[in-house]
Every structure is written in structure tokens, then in C-alpha cells.
Amino acid sequence: FYDLAEARHAMKDSGFGSPVMFLGAEGSADMAAAEIAELLKVCARNGGQDIGPDGAEGWIGRRFDFSTIENVLNSRGGVAETIEIANTWSGIGGTYDALTKAMKPFADEVLGHFSHAYTDGVSLYVILLGKADDPAGAEARLKQIWEAANRAVLDSGAVLSHHHGTGIARNDHVREALGSSWDLYGRLKEAMDPSGILNPGKLGS
């Protein structure tokens, strides 16, 4: 499910005028057809419009094409980053609004899509594409991006990461995110790694 900005990339159509969701079903032909028919009914009841299979079929063939991001990174001062987080269904709308708003000052394009979905929530990817004056400026921009992103995520009640891990960019905010669980994780790490040799400077440090 792609927001308007990323839908234009997913559809390879710079004039595409709405968010887009690609639907698929697995199983026997009859079962898959029945599932798709029901999904389309749900979409229609919520204002969606069936635009046919061409967009999804084209996307399937290029969904792992990262050349747009690679081209940005290969340019002098290019800035590209992916931020993935998660929240409940009731909270993800507020998180999306807060995070995309917080990122707009730092990028030429702010793209968003939902990826992994569950009964109780969903993960959100926000992709940033932009340009600084030089590599040093790009590095400084990335630090600003992560500070603003982490703040927006936590303030909106989301979790810092879905499945990519926290990494160094989120490390300063992990204690706040974990709350009282921080002490438990710290004690577990001390018990398993009393000499502090496993991935030093990361979780629990």
C-alpha cells in the first residue's frame, strides 16, 4: 500500500494521482479468484477503485530494483535513507502524518508505504531522497534525519523499528523506547556477556 508520493514510483507514472495498493492471493485458481473478489469488495466499500492488473504486474517485475536510490547515493552529496517502524492500526495514521511531516524539511522526496501487516498493526516504511552540498553535508543531514525521525516515532506511540533492528542511528533512543524493559535487557546482557565483548557500544550500553 503506497502513499501518493511513492505510488508514482511504484506505478512508473509521474502523473499518477492517488495512493495505490497491490492485491494478490495464493492457492488454487478458484480460491485465489474468490479471495481477490472479496478484497475488491472491501476496497470498493472504502472508496477504492479497481484499476486492473497492469500496475501490479509491472511492479512484480521490478520490486527489487533499487536503482533510484542507488543513483541518488552515487551522486555527490546524495542523501537516501529508509526508516521502518511499526504501530497499531489505530495509531499508524498519526505516526505516518507525524513522521512524514518531520522528514519533509530534510529531503526532496518523502515516500511511504505499508509492508508487513497483521491483525493488530502494520509496519511503515518511509524513504527519503535528497541532496546536500557535499558528503560532509550529507552525513550531517542523515544525523538530523534520524534525530527528528526517532522523536516523531516515539512521540506518536510507535516502536522504533519493526524488523531491521535498531542500529546505531536509533541507539540513543532505545532506553526511552524500552521503558522499564531496559533494565531487564541490561541484566540479561550482563549475565550472558559479563566481559562486554559482544557487540560493544550497542544495546545495553
Describe the residue ranges of each PLM region.
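Single, functionally critical "micro-switch" positions that shape active/binding sites
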Residues: 87, 163, 192
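Short, loop-centered acidic/histidine patches that primarily coordinate divalent metals
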Residues: 127-131, 163-166, 203
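Short basic/hydrophobic patches in alpha-helices and adjacent helix-turn junctions
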Residues: 148-159, 175-176, 187-190
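General beta-strand structural signal in soluble alpha/beta enzymes
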Residues: 52-53, 162, 198-199
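Activity-critical C-terminal alpha-helical subdomain
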Residues: 167-205
